[in-house]
Amino acid sequence: MKVPGIEAIFTYKDVDQNMKRFTCAGQTYPEPSPYDRLILDKHVRFIGDPVAIVAGADERCVDKAMKLIKTEYEVLEPLLDFTKAKDNEILVHPEDNWEALCPVGADNKRNLCAHDESGDGDIDKVLDECDIVIDRTYHTKACQQSMMETFRTFCTIDTYGRLHVVSSTQIVFHCRRIISHALGISPSKIRVTKPRIGGGFGAKQTSVSEIYPAFVTWKTKKP
């Protein structure tokens, strides 16, 4: 750590790659979203996937340190078309510690995070009797909640040695469970506080900003 003010730098080597994975989705346990995440994963899957956590005294020193980090990648054959992902030999999540707690048709060996088929009556028979059958595929554009307050989190260690997470979140107790899974510690060692927030509209129903500061504070015992 050659940059003054840098407190810690973490990579996938600081995270047990064989530990139980977690989901960031704020859903009632057992969550229908698969447990497919690690805080830092050796296997990165897209541009923007985190490869390091840099913690420092201020934003300036962190920005400087980030520019000095060099990362070597082993480039794998990509899977870029989601319509060809099912049962493809290229697996997005090949790891054995991937887990789906709910029977939603998830199977990482088939690139499925969920799958369901349902119908009422003899659908093929009804379609055969129709004069006109229209078969089209529709795609909706991406959307994002535009709340006034953005995602914000800070963490400390309280008097009792617990991890205290103060966050602009809609899911206090889900957040505690998610952080517990991510860090591999008991929920009793975590306290989550939600001050009055400036909007969320569902966007803050996911652990977006809590995991990384929680990890850094638990490791360093510093805010």
Model-derived features: positions:
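Alpha-helical support elements that line or immediately flank enzyme active sites
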Residues: 1-16, 52-73, 153-195, 200-220
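Flexible, low-hydrophobicity surface segments
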Residues: 1-105, 136, 219
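Cofactor-centric catalytic regions
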Residues: 2, 10, 15-28, 55, ...
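Short, solvent-exposed polar/charged micro-motifs at secondary-structure junctions
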Residues: 18-23, 88-91, 143-148, 199-204
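Residue-level signal for pocket-adjacent positions within structured domains
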Residues: 33-34, 39, 86, 129, ...
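Residues that act as N-cap/strand-start positions at coil-to-secondary-structure junctions
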Residues: 38, 147-151, 210
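Helix-loop-helix junctions that connect adjacent transmembrane helices in secondary transporters/permeases
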Residues: 92-183
